Amino acid sequence: MKDESETDERNHLEGVEEGEIVDAEPDTLSLTPEQHERLKSLIHGSDLFDEITNAENRYLIFGRNEGELGERRKKLQQLLDSRRSATAFRLEDFGLTSDDIHLWAPAFDVLSETATHVVGVLEDYDGGHVWEMGLLYYRQSNVRDTLWILKRTYEDDDLQRERYDNGMAASHIAALEESIADRVVTWRTEDDLEEAVKKVP
């Protein structure tokens, strides 16, 4: 007869302890068993995951996904993906949709541990990527060692404040940026962004 604990261990999602994501503690990532199984299927059932694990440099790209901001993020992904022995990927590449909202945080948790570099394209403090940065701030000091932020700055001071004045998020992200000061690269134009990404090893 199989040991139940051994069976459970084989069913765990690599990189995430089941107790950590099922317990309904305020600071944990809560998933139902069904959600946990879907997350495992989306990530480990993807051909992309095999490609990622075989690459020497693995870039997880996060940031806004709408309109021009999303296009710039895709461009960054293409630039990093074109490097030798490298692959660049986003959560969306694993088939996560708006219906999987509860899976985005734990998926980011797992994939950021898998990545050799976590690269954020930051143009404002609005959107799901702010939550992802908060997760890095609170829970993953080891992942912070791999974090790079490509942060857009604006010539107009009022616009700068409008884009980055977001109360608690601003203070938390400012602390995160300070902790990785030499890996925060600023840019203003798309040409600047192409130059900025060259600083990411």
What are these regions (language model features)?
Residues 1-201:
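Conserved catalytic or regulatory cores that recognize and/or transform ribose-phosphate-containing ligands
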